[in-house]
Amino acid sequence: MHQHYDSATQTYVNTDEQGIVRGLTPEEPIVSDADSAQVAAQKYLEQHAELLGVEPAALDNLTAEREAQPVDAGSEFRIHTEKQQFDTTTVAYDQTYFGLPVWEASVAVHVKHDPYRVVSASSTRHPDLTAKRPPAKAIERFKEIDQPTLASLLGLKPGAKAAKSLKITSTRLVVYQYEAAKRQPEGEAPGDEELVAHDHPSLPLPPLPASIVEDGHYVSAVVHFQLGTSRFPLLNWRAIIDVATGAVLHLRPFVDDVSALVFEEDPITTAPSGPLPNAASTLLNPKRKSVALQGLNPPSNGTQALQGTIVTVSDVESPAVAPPTEPTGTDFNFDSRTNEFAAANAYFHCDRFFRLVEGMGFNLASYFGPTPFPSPVDHRGFGGTGNVINAHCLGLAGGTGILQTAFALADLNDLTHPIGIACDWRVVLHELGGHGILYPHVHSPNFGFSHSAGDSFAAILNDPISAAPDRFVTFPWVNIGRRHDRPVNGWAWYGLNDVGGYSTEQILATTHFRIYRSLGGDAALPVGIGSRKFAARFVSYLILRAVGSLTPATNPPKVDQGWVQALLAADLGDWTTEGHIGGAYGKVIRWAFEKQGLYQPAGTIPPVSTEGQPPPIDVYIDDGRHGEYQYQPVHWECQAIWNRRHPDGLTTHENPVVGHTNYAYVKIKNRGTKKAQGIRVKAFHANPTIGLVYPTDWKPMATAQLAAPDLAPNSAVEEIVGPFKWKPTQVGHECMFMIVSAKGDASNVSNFSPGETIPEWRLVPHDNNIGQRNVVPVAFKGPKDWMAVISKLPFTLKNPNRRASRMQLVATLPRVLVQRGWKLELLNASGSPIKGGSLKLGAGKTSDLSIRLVAGEPFTAAEVVKWRDAMIRIEGYADGILIGGMTYPMAPAQKG
């Protein structure tokens, strides 16, 4: 993908390698006066047709329905669907030709509500489309296609056993672009990264006639049918058949599987790590954990079955292994190496996944479409003897939802005492989080560019508590070579290994995992567990919401032709059920794909092996990351912001004088590839507080904003902006904030509507346009002097959450002072020590605090200069999430 900024419309434009526009992102959401999301989308397309590369005439029938039979019409767009999630509606328009939908070709507009405002648009349209209209007789033949005709077209021999199970479920006409590589699913042969080959059902299709050419468009019939195989007695398929010749252009079974993966939170993930899957029950059993099986139906006639409101364990595939039952009041407690244990795990994990999705605010019935609930799960299936290491998720007719999920084994060394692969939460996440969520939205088990996002869920949701020796092995119990830390050299987008399937899935998992790490996944343990869990949950929500915005026509054929845009649109929407406003993480998402090789300069010839380019304009305040987005826990220590007591322009920080005019300064740079113009810097201050909320707690300085000189690209120059006049009123050094923006690079605060608020910990570290300084240098001559000054620097702890939270303060002293017996106590407003640094605060409530030092062995100012950690740092946590802090460097006494 290449990206440029269109200054006329203030829009970022993404184009593919052929220069076709694939995405539009306004610098700021475009507010519409429309009375519906569809009207807002229609107006946006009409106003931006040229920018999107669409002829205005192609938009004349946006509200018309797609045709069932060919009519006299060229390439145009017609309404397909509206999909609402939380506060955002995706309005999707199918590209049509002859009035028929063009397969997987669409324009989608993402519209946020109250008021309606367009946040982005994506396109998978086919440029320069032409197709021949087939004869009327050929069209009539496919109106009434029967089983024998279809069997012949599929290459099945008359009277063959397989043909007897053939049943047509639906047909419709489309325009399809033929690609030889996509005619049938190709099995991935074993190699350096795989231990076993991946088996996909296929049929002996007849050869294509000479009239079928690569990239040609053909009026075709989409035929959904059932056809059993030896492994899958009930299997739904899709064939796309050229109407004129009867040639099968595309064939897919609605099934997908993952090979050689294997336990609950698997024994490698849980501490202590181990044992391996070939271990005996005596070694595996200690890893078992007693959990409540939620949603079970009441016992019937004194017998409890593994059947619930969301999931039911059923023997729907061979081998015939009936699920266990227990007398009323008896737990499902079994040895690890038993089919019964696998059944209990199958119920728990599959139910757990659906409840995870539901708990994030997604309605199961609407998100999973026609998927029947309770969803059938076979703990010991997969066809035949089932003696394989595998699992799969089958689709309904037409691939519109989940038919059933089946699990085989996790180890083949002891088939007398089998251990099921359903015991591995990571495998369940790959199946249901990968294929299960794709079926109802794109009517396929796969993305157009990658196997799925299942590896991403497996990696991200298991990482916060993982004890695995290598956190980047995606399935650590039986290592099949799949990783989520693939280097850009060799594993870039459009690189050597971006070939689809499991290979590209590793590139996708690496990119998603980088987002997770930036949002808190790299927080230090054990204190950072809350930040890790929040990041894992939020990134999982973004992936779910992005998938939920897709349609069969917008299933991304390439990562930069719909998926990146879907993630960015998901971020801009508000997570209404959790109380998180959207728009905080878009820059991190863009950066994560950039680091994996996307956004190359125009004209770059694949294979890509280097990181991509930053945005054209990317002004920033350097917090030590040079404008990038690696995890930054101490986001409040930005040294590019400082105070002077006089407007002298010097760069050494001076503590502000309360009640007097002070002068703030900031350094800014431009990481982008183009010169930044129209730069402005806004300045704010706030009471010395951990847990601040924007904009509630941020007060503009007396000099609220200043213009800044143009900035050269590539961080070549640094400009100092100031002075900003301000008058602090609070003892203890008020917090200082700066926000820089330029034409083409607005801060994330521009994404927020009036009345919306966001805590600093979600805002500041994820927007390089913003800098924050809660740094209070403490001047002293000796230990007693230092103790006295510190005791006079009060601060406030605020709970920024919308619910009551357990607050935790973690204070650190210089290592040398700890060794010399120094201690630090945190005191409440009445002067009493806070036991364990922990207290509970209601939503938005505050507590005034102060610091008391308990002296140990003495030290001198001369010694302090040699210490690398000569500071007190106080970190604040709310329900385990790092929300901010205060830092007090030890410094020689200042003059003046």
Identify what each model region corresponds to.
Residues 1-160:
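Preferential activation on post-signal-peptide N-terminal prodomains/segments
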Residues 2-7, 11, 33, 176-211, ...:
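Acidic/polar low-complexity interaction segments
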Residues 39-51, 58-115, 242-247, 253-256, ...:
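Active-site-adjacent structural elements in enzyme catalytic domains
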Residues 105, 233-236, 421-422:
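Short, small/polar residue-rich loop motifs at catalytic or cofactor-binding pockets
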Residues 123-212:
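Charged, low-complexity helical/coil segments in non-catalytic cytosolic or luminal regions
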Residues 175-213, 272-282, 312-326, 330, ...:
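Surface-exposed intrinsically disordered loops and tails
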Residues 283, 322-361, 368-611:
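Extracellular protease catalytic domains of secreted zymogens
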Residues 607-896:
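Extracellular/luminal regions of secreted and cell-surface proteins that mediate adhesion/ECM remodeling
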